[in-house]
Amino acid sequence: MIKLENLMSIDKEQLPEAAKVISSSELSTIVKLLSEKNDKIRYQAFLLLQYRSLQFNDVYPYWENFRLKLRDSNSYQRSIGIMLIAENARWDLENKMEASLDDCMELLKDEKPITVRQSIQSLGKIAEAKPNLNEKIASMLMSIDMVEIKETMRKSILLDILNVLAAISKSLKSDKIDSFIFNSLSGGILDKKAIKQIEMLLI
């Protein structure tokens, strides 16, 4: 059984390797630590599960735990939920993602801009793992009303959206996506550096 002091003694650089040697029986303890009020403990547990999910499918059985977090009153928990769902979409042979997508989409309207950003980035990972959902994901991203977003966050959020749409456009040909990207690049929210960044993705 993994001990808390052992968990917290792992350096950030060692986390990817540490995640490889976690036993399946220790995972339930680490998943429970996601609800810790202590930020450091919670974040360490999250990173271990995130790295573990990149290589093994034994975090996937906790999918419903992560889905419940999407509706948590705490924004950190909502972010943890969607990010771990995104990492485990690659293992989703039971097609749970289809049933969870609407809950994930709700976070695009989250009160916390950082949660909105993490949700958009997570949807990018989901789109990569689940190409059949690309059209729905793209549609929801394009429906985000930038006017309702805090002005200081508009550029960052629009860049996140365009990064995902640029990736989706590689496999999903859509006039709507092309038009949205074009209008966004000429809409005045992005600076020259950001525009160049997106243009490079479209090559």
Model-derived segments and spans:
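N-terminal alpha-helical scaffold/docking segments in eukaryotic complex subunits
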Residues: 1-52, 165-170, 178-203
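Residue-level detector of extended alpha-helical repeat arrays and alpha-solenoid scaffolds
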Residues: 11, 42, 78, 116, ...
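Amphipathic alpha-helical scaffolding segments comprising HEAT/armadillo-like alpha-solenoid repeats
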Residues: 21-34, 57-68, 94-107, 131-146, ...
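Short inter-helical turns and helix N-cap capping residues of alpha-solenoid HEAT/ARM repeat scaffolds
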Residues: 37-39, 73-75, 111-113, 149-150, ...
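Non-membrane alpha-helical segments in proteins
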Residues: 40-52, 65, 79-87
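Structural signature of alpha-helical solenoid repeat scaffolds
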Residues: 50-51, 86, 124-125, 159-166
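Alpha-solenoid helical repeat scaffolds
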Residues: 54-55, 90-91, 128-129, 171
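Hydrophobic, well-structured mid-protein blocks that either form specific transmembrane helices
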Residues: 72-121
